[in-house]
Amino acid sequence: MKIDLTTLVTESRNKASENIDVLSTVEMLTVINQEDQKVALAVEAILPQIADVVDAIAVAFQSGGRLIYTGAGTSGRLGILDASECPPTYGSNPDLVVGLIAGGHKAILKAVENAEDNRELGASDLQDLGLNEKDVLVGIAASGRTPYVLGAMEYAKSVGATVATLSCNPNSPMTELADINMTPVVGPEVVTGSSRMKAGTAQKLVLNMLTTGAMIRTGKVFGNLMVDVEATNAKLVQRQKNIVIEATGCSEVEASEALSQCDNHCKTAILMVLSGLDAQSAKAKLAQHNGFIRNALSDQ
């Protein structure tokens, strides 16, 4: 079956790089860098749509739902990367944000032939996860037409989940299925069709915003401090202390004492120092206010 890619922005030729193979190395890299500068502007143009998805994810988290990313190739790997960073950064359950890739885990390191063309696989992977109406699905595909992602989106719609799309081609088949469309149009790639470049960069920027925004909206950031970070290595043990110090103005000794009294739960230590509560009372107060430090502090 012939696939017509001629109408896709991501498959068109970039006039700025038509002679890139005869440029000096610095000139070549200058072209790439100049093209990359267009990416942030393309993302800026869709901030309202990104905000809608962030708010939907926050509601899902607060209602017992999850964020599920689905994609093939680079798009799938970027979703997995973003999902994998949430537990160490925000202390979240690994099941809260999940990344799926066409072809499964082996496709993370090596392309699995034809996996992205399997529409039924996109649906069955979500069935295996038990996707339901509380969840948010973000379908990721630069082209906006990947069958694996389309199958996943169709299944998500059928169970009542919120469906968003992240693609770099306007008016794609994916946009017709989504409740919310995020379409940063970055233009033709420096190497024609190599959507791991500008399109991939745009996707990474948007995914950063989705999880960061949702975690902020659900109380996992105080000021600009990652107050739910877990002390899983030496660097993060020190980071926890530094966060308590920054949030409260206390000494390192006081920060260490507070953390030791509350099983190294950063939020609890901060509330203990700022409110004078003991560890048990501080934990209870945080639970009462769904983990929001500011709300717990105002209820004194």
From Swiss-Prot:
Specifically catalyzes the cleavage of the D-lactyl ether substituent of MurNAc 6-phosphate, producing GlcNAc 6-phosphate and D-lactate. Together with AnmK, is also required for the utilization of anhydro-N-acetylmuramic acid (anhMurNAc) either imported from the medium or derived from its own cell wall murein, and thus plays a role in cell wall recycling. Gene3D superfamilies: 1.10.8.1080, Glucose-6-phosphate isomerase like protein, domain 1. Pfam families: GKRP_SIS_N. CDD domains: SIS_Etherase. Homodimer. Keywords: Carbohydrate metabolism, Lyase. It comes from the Bacteria. InterPro entries: Etherase_MurQ (IPR005488), Glucokinase_regulatory_CS (IPR005486), MURQ/GCKR (IPR040190), SIS_dom (IPR001347), SIS_dom_sf (IPR046348). The active site is at E85, E116. SUPFAM superfamilies: SIS domain. Residues 57-220 form the SIS domain. A lyase-type mechanism (elimination/hydration) is suggested for the cleavage of the lactyl ether bond of MurNAc 6-phosphate, with the formation of an alpha,beta-unsaturated aldehyde intermediate with (E)-stereochemistry, followed by the syn addition of water to give product. Its EC number is 4.2.1.126. It catalyses: N-acetyl-D-muramate 6-phosphate + H2O = N-acetyl-D-glucosamine 6-phosphate + (R)-lactate. GO terms for molecular function: carbohydrate derivative binding; carbon-oxygen lyase activity; ether hydrolase activity. Pathway: Amino-sugar metabolism; 1,6-anhydro-N-acetylmuramate degradation; Amino-sugar metabolism; N-acetylmuramate degradation; Cell wall biogenesis; peptidoglycan recycling. GO terms for biological process: 1,6-anhydro-N-acetyl-beta-muramic acid catabolic process; amino sugar catabolic process; N-acetylmuramic acid catabolic process; peptidoglycan turnover. Belongs to the GCKR-like family. MurNAc-6-P etherase subfamily. Disulfide bonds: none annotated. This is N-acetylmuramic acid 6-phosphate etherase.
